[in-house]
Amino acid sequence: MVWLVAMTPRQSSLCGLAAHGLWFLGLVLLMDATARPANHSSTRERAANREENEIMPPDHLNGVKLEMDGHLNKDFHQEVFLGKDMDGFDEDSEPRRSRRKLMVIFSKVDVNTDRRISAKEMQHWIMEKTAEHFQEAVKENKLHFRAVDPDGDGHVSWDEYKVKFLASKGHNEREIAEAIKNHEELKVDEETQEVLGNLRDRWYQADNPPADLLLTEDEFLSFLHPEHSRGMLKFMVKEIFRDLDQDGDKQLSLPEFISLPVGTVENQQGQDIDDNWVKDRKKEFEELIDSNHDGIVTMEELENYMDPMNEYNALNEAKQMIAIADENQNHHLEPEEILKYSEFFTGSKLMDYARNVHEEF
């Protein structure tokens, strides 16, 4: 099942927009502070890995709170604020141009043009940006599906996929295809065998009833992007529970959720990382995932939390994002605030001080 997202076009007065735009442009031109772009190497590495293994389900899903391995998505707020414009704020961007882009985004979120962003306005924006990520995934899936469906019959079997997957890992495609055809044992290492087992389970889960072990393009989308299917989202939650639920009671306690990853580095830098890991996950568990605040997270609660098209979650995220930068505590986001906290919203620190802006006004 693929979710279709309908979006209502935004409408506003041309005169109002012109005045509003001039005001923002004036504000941005006042800012000459030196910028320090953030390091986007992790984003680029993920893109490179995706190109190498385009038919392998990604660990990272844009606009989804948790990675497939249960880690928090560190880029989530930037993804749901910038949408397809994330690349426009990379380390090569010119700071002043980036500030202008940020103010253009501000004006789009600020639907009623009162020069401040409310939680409702931010919620609607988050939903739109999430829909953009959905549409991008659908577009990419068409290319990925063609890679595993060379005969173009609109269906891919598990064996066909397995051949393409192993070929992408450096195995001889012809030899693998011949071995599978003759029901011979594949000569792959133990790690690859384990990956294949997990992929097979996921493949069967994506095969909508009546099961025929053949995936259509839509089913293949669910296979690669479980956030597009309610059934696959449930499967993703079960996989995360399998990794985190230490006592097997099908519930997650706070200690289970904040457990440190294996291979902790025993030095000060490693300790700082560990402290941040615990702090971030504890906050996420208590404030967002555990919706009834009983100290336990059920599969249903985790599924609701991970559902990128959950409007209630989007509103909570909107409030949280505003609270990060809301220095005057008016429950709205203002231009000076979003510029001062630009690193949170865009990944780039576009100005070193906001005090000068205030003094100019």
Curated annotation (Swiss-Prot):
Positions carrying Phosphoserine: 98
Annotated localization: Golgi apparatus lumen
EF-hand domain mapped to chain residues: 97-132, 136-171, 196-231, 232-267, 277-312, 313-348
Signal peptide: 1-35
This protein's record includes keyword Plastid: no
Residues engaged in binding Ca(2+) 4: 245, 247, 249, 251, 256
Annotated binding of Ca(2+) 1, by residue: 110, 112, 114, 116, 121
Chain segments carrying region Necessary for intracellular retention in Golgi apparatus lumen: 308-361
Residue positions binding Ca(2+) 3: 212, 219
Residue numbers binding Ca(2+) 2: 149, 151, 153, 155, 160
Gene Ontology CC annotation, any one: Golgi lumen
Amino-acid positions noted as binding Ca(2+) 5 in the UniProt annotation, renumbered to this chain: 290, 292, 294, 301
SUPFAM superfamilies: EF-hand
Residues annotated as binding Ca(2+) 6: 326, 328, 330, 332, 337
Free-text tissue specificity from the UniProt record: Ubiquitous.
MF-aspect GO terms: calcium ion binding
InterPro entries for the chain: CAB45_EFh (IPR027240), EF-hand-dom_pair (IPR011992), EF_Hand_1_Ca_BS (IPR018247), EF_hand_dom (IPR002048)
Residues the record marks as carrying a glycan: 39
Residues carrying Phosphothreonine: 192, 216, 264, 298
Family the UniProt entry places it in: Belongs to the CREC family.
Domain writeup: Binds calcium, probably via its EF-hands.
Task of the protein: May regulate calcium-dependent activities in the endoplasmic reticulum lumen or post-ER compartment.
Protein name: 45 kDa calcium-binding protein
Organism: Mus musculus (Mouse)
Gene that encodes it: Sdf4
